[in-house]
A protein has these predicted regions:
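C-terminal scaffold of the Radical SAM
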Residues: 1-309
Length: 310
C-alpha cells in the first residue's frame, strides 16, 4: 500500500480466477489485510467473483461479515449441457441454491454473468437463459459473447469453425456475425424492457447499481493490481507483476522491504516484470476507445479536463 499511501480506495475487486474456491478464513484474512494496508472509503464497492460450484452458505456469510458488499457470479448459462461444454463445475440447480443463500446472507448487489455465441447455441435457447436470470431480479447482468482465444483447448476443439467465422464464412456449430448481432440487439431490448439500463457494451444494471470498479477502468482512473501477472496503472505508468510464483512470494514475503522507488520513477522493481510509461498520445487513444465502450461516451468537457486541451 506504500505507493498508494496518499490515496483513498473507492473500489476493490477480488477476481482473476476463482476466489470463491478459497476457504472462507483466507478471504477474511485478505479483507483484514487490505484494511490495514490501505485507506478504504466507508462506502467502497467491494466485489468478489464467485463460481457457483465453489460457494457455500458459510462462505457467503463470512464474505458479508468481513465487508464484501457485491458479488459477481459466473453462471454463463441456465442449461447444464452448455455448462458442461464450457467446462464449468456447477449446474444450474447449484447456482439457484447459492443465489438464494447469497440473498439470505444479506447481499443486495449481485451481478450474474451470461454468455452467448456458444457452440450449437440457438438465439431462442440463449434468450431462455436470459429471461430465467431476469426473473431472479439481480441488480446487474453482464452479457458477454464467447471469444475463442488461440492456444486454448476450446480453440483446438473448434478451430476450423473459429477460422471460418473470422473469415466471415458460415460454420456448422458457431453462430455467424448476423446471429451475434441479433442476440446483442435482443439482449438489449429484453433487458431494457425489464428495467436494466445498458451503460457499457456488455453491462446492464438497475439504476444506481452500475459497477463502479469497471467504470474506473473505462475512465482510466489509477488502479493497483495484486497477485501473479496482475496489471496496475499508476500515474500513467503501466505495471505487470511477475508471473513466477516463487519469485512473487519471495519479493512480497516482507511487504515493508518492497522498494517503491521504481514505482515512483516508472521503473520495474523485482516484483514487476514490466513497467511502461504511457505516452500522451497513447493516453488519449486509450481514453477514447475505452470511453466509447460506455453509453455515455466521451464529452468535450471531460476530455479537456483530463488532457488540458480541446
Amino acid at each position: 500500500g506504500e505507493c498508494c499511501r496518499d490515496r483513498r480506495v473507492s473500489t476493490i475487486y477480488i477476481g482473476g480466477g476463482t476466489p470463491s474456491w478459497l476457504p472462507e478464513q483466507y478471504m477474511e484474512l485478505i479483507q483484514k489485510q487490505l484494511r490495514v494496508s490501505f485507506d478504504i472509503d466507508e462506502a467502497a464497492e467491494i466485489t468478489v467473483e464467485c463460481n457457483p460450484g465453489t460457494l457455500t452458505g458459510q462462505k457467503l456469510m463470512t464474505y458479508k461479515a468481513c465487508g464484501v458488499n457485491r458479488l459477481s457470479i459466473g453462471l454463463q448459462s441456465t442449461f447444464d449441457d452448455e455448462l458442461k461444454l464450457l467446462g464449468r463445475v456447477h449446474t444450474y440447480e447449484q447456482f439457484l441454491r447459492n443465489y438464494e443463500l447469497a440473498r439470505k446472507a444479506g447481499f443486495s448487489n449481485i451481478n450474474i454473468d451470461l454468455m452467448s455465441a456458444l457452440p450449437y447455441q440457438t438465439t431462442v435457447k440463449y434468450l431462455t437463459s436470459l429471461k430465467r436470470v431476469i426473473a431472479l431480479r439481480p441488480e446487474h447482468i453482464s452479457a458477454y459473447s464467447l471469444i475463442i482465444e488461440k492456444g486454448t483447448p476450446f480453440y483446438e476443439k473448434y478451430r476450423f469453425d473459429a477460422v471460418k467465422r473470422e473469415a466471415g464464412m458460415r460454420t456448422e456449430c458457431l453462430p455467424g456475425e448476423e446471429t451475434e448481432y441479433e442476440i446483442y440487439e435482443k439482449t438489449k431490448e429484453v433487458l431494457e424492457q425489464n428495467g436494466y439500463r445498458q451503460y457499457e457494451i456488455s453491462n446492464y444494471a438497475k439504476a444506481g447499481y452500475e459497477c463502479r470498479h469497471n467504470i474506473g477502468y473505462w475512465k482510466r482512473t489509477d488502479y493497483l493490481g495484486m497477485g501473479l501477472g496482475a496489471a496496475s496503472l499508476i500515474d500513467n505508468v503501466r505495471y505487470t507483476n511477475a508471473r513466477d510464483l516463487f519469485l512473487y512470494i519471495e519479493e512480497t514475503s516482507d511487504i515493508h522491504a518492497v522498494s517503491i522507488e521504481g514505482v515512483e520513477h516508472g521503473m520495474a522493481t523485482n516484483l514487476h516484470e514490466q513497467a511502461d510509461v504511457v505516452s500522451r498520445n497513447a493516453q488519449i487513444e486509450e481514453y477514447m476507445f475505452l470511453g466509447l465502450r460506455m453509453n455515455a461516451g466521451v464529452t468535450r468537457e471531460d476530455f479537456a479536463k483530463c488532457f488540458s486541451c480541446s
